[in-house]
Amino acid sequence: MNKIIKIFKSLLVIVLLSSFGFQKQETCSLTVDVSELRNSKGTVQFALYNREDALPDEHYKKYFKKLTGKIVNGASTVTFENLPEGKYVVNILHDENNDGKIKRGIILPKEGIGFSNFQSIGISNRPTFSKASFSVPGDKKIKVNIIYL
């Protein structure tokens, strides 16, 4: 009888642990649209950031995830999958020459760039994580404006 009780208790513990302690973490997706690209040359680089110290990232090396989107009729869309809920920033680059880097003039970029929550960018209006971030509590879709300087 004691053996049956021990087996029953063990099974009960296993069932409780598997239903409460090992639940799969919920993930979500983020779809990002950009339109009004000045031409259909190259691709669009979509960099996703999830850390305060990741911006600025002028060399595209501090991102959490990065996707490349094809350009169709002056627009591009990608979807980041399996994201944990949290705060994110999206940075886009219209990579017209497909080299994976921002082509620069003397100071300013020659290719289009954009950040979530930004309508314009300038020397006095540089994106930071706190200014450009947004919450992703579940599946979400956003639009990022492309800016040519």
Name each model-derived stretch.
Residues 47-52, 56-67:
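Short amphipathic beta-strand segments in non-cytosolic proteins
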Residues 86-92:
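A short tyrosine-centered beta-strand micro-motif
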Residues 99:
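Acidic carboxylate motifs that coordinate Ca2+ or other divalent cations, activating on Asp/Glu
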